[in-house]
Amino acid sequence: MTTQRLVSAAGQWDEEAIDRAIRPKRLEDYVGQRAMREQMAIFIQAALGRGEALDHVLIFGPPGLGKTTLANIIANELGVNVRHTSGPVLEKAGDLAALLTNLEPRDVLFIDEIHRLGAVVEEVLYPAMEDYQIDIMIGEGPAARSIKLDLPPFTLVGATTRAGLLTSPLRDRFGIVHRLEFYSVEELSRIVARSARILGSEITPEGAAEVARRSRGTPRIANRLLRRVRDFAQVMADGRITGEVAGKALEMLDVDPNGFDQSDRRLLLTMMEKFEGGPVGLDNLAAAIGEERGTIEDVLEPYLIQQGFIMRTPRGRVATRNAYLHFGLKPPQRTNVNEELFGDE
């Protein structure tokens, strides 16, 4: 099973301390997502001017793009505290009530994976978001009674990688909604250069660009690759990260110029060599490469689809012309479902 991939956008347990050190603290230091930054700066300034809590904020998009970082920045810009939790952790209504009643006025409550909130907990959240009130039950059995508690005005920042799983009543209660997009190579180069400065590593523009190109449009991956390249530069070079040093380090780490690792290449080659490029069903593909359906669907496929190397069709997965050209292979003649992918050879 694919775990702890170097190019995985999911966070890893041993990265948290370093990630905290290199995360930007203010909007002016946040690279990329220009439209979102400009809008958030206006909303925050307006809320501060009125002395009110910022409207509730929903941030969605692929993992590793900076949702947690943005929640911390919002709190810093507002000059308030931020409390962190996640959907799976809030198992009971009382868990959420305890968090809400301990907030100070205008504090930020950050709920990661908010799409995984249970229905009972979500019901408690509705009046809290809308009216700054919650209903809690006191006692048990016939003597039980409901009391209404007033909450201080607060800002809920919800983050999710799967916005489509949010219920309409919850989604409609967010006044500010932003989707985070993948980053350009130029933006990632700036992020890598900034992180290198914070880590005390010397890096050239070419070195930063080389790391950025292989980072799959994702800052979390860029920072992870930078740390590994820094190790390589320290031991195998003079400590300075040049384009050549970064390239050699990443080749040794099995990350190619497209940001693909061994798992990506195995998936693509299996489709092309064993299934003639497809269409191939997900179950057959999972059995052929020894992975679970969910791993292919949620971990391996998204980036390959986004880059145009795999296409989902009603009949199954298909390797595109880009996939064949990437490996120096000749795309086969196609008919029917795949004619539009390969054209006439």
UniProtKB/Swiss-Prot annotation:
Write down the superkingdom of origin: Bacteria
Chain residue ranges for the region called Large ATPase domain (RuvB-L):
1-183
Q: Which residues bind DNA?
A: 293, 312, 317
Taken from the UniProt entry, a GO cellular component term is: Holliday junction resolvase complex
Enzyme Commission identifier(s): 3.6.4.-
Entry note about domains: Has 3 domains, the large (RuvB-L) and small ATPase (RuvB-S) domains and the C-terminal head (RuvB-H) domain. The head domain binds DNA, while the ATPase domains jointly bind ATP, ADP or are empty depending on the state of the subunit in the translocation cycle. During a single DNA translocation step the structure of each domain remains the same, but their relative positions change.
Keyword DNA damage tagged: yes
Q: Per its record, how is this protein called by name?
A: Holliday junction branch migration complex subunit RuvB
Listed under catalytic activity are:
ATP + H2O = ADP + phosphate + H(+)
For the region Small ATPAse domain (RuvB-S), give the residue spans: 184-254
The residues forming a coiled coil are: none
Q: Which InterPro entries match?
A: AAA+_ATPase, AAA_lid_4, DNA_helicase_Holl-junc_RuvB, P-loop_NTPase, RuvB-like_N, RuvB_C, WH-like_DNA-bd_sf, WH_DNA-bd_sf
What is the protein's major site of localization? cytoplasm
What job does the chain carry out?
A: The RuvA-RuvB-RuvC complex processes Holliday junction (HJ) DNA during genetic recombination and DNA repair, while the RuvA-RuvB complex plays an important role in the rescue of blocked DNA replication forks via replication fork reversal (RFR). RuvA specifically binds to HJ cruciform DNA, conferring on it an open structure. The RuvB hexamer acts as an ATP-dependent pump, pulling dsDNA into and through the RuvAB complex. RuvB forms 2 homohexamers on either side of HJ DNA bound by 1 or 2 RuvA tetramers; 4 subunits per hexamer contact DNA at a time.
Q: How does it assemble?
A: Homohexamer. Forms an RuvA(8)-RuvB(12)-Holliday junction (HJ) complex. HJ DNA is sandwiched between 2 RuvA tetramers; dsDNA enters through RuvA and exits via RuvB. An RuvB hexamer assembles on each DNA strand where it exits the tetramer. Each RuvB hexamer is contacted by two RuvA subunits (via domain III) on 2 adjacent RuvB subunits; this complex drives branch migration. In the full resolvosome a probable DNA-RuvA(4)-RuvB(12)-RuvC(2) complex forms which resolves the HJ.
Q: Where does Mg(2+) bind?
A: 68
The record lists ATP as bound by 22-23, 64, 67-69, 130-132, 173, 183, 220
Q: Which family does it belong to?
A: Belongs to the RuvB family.
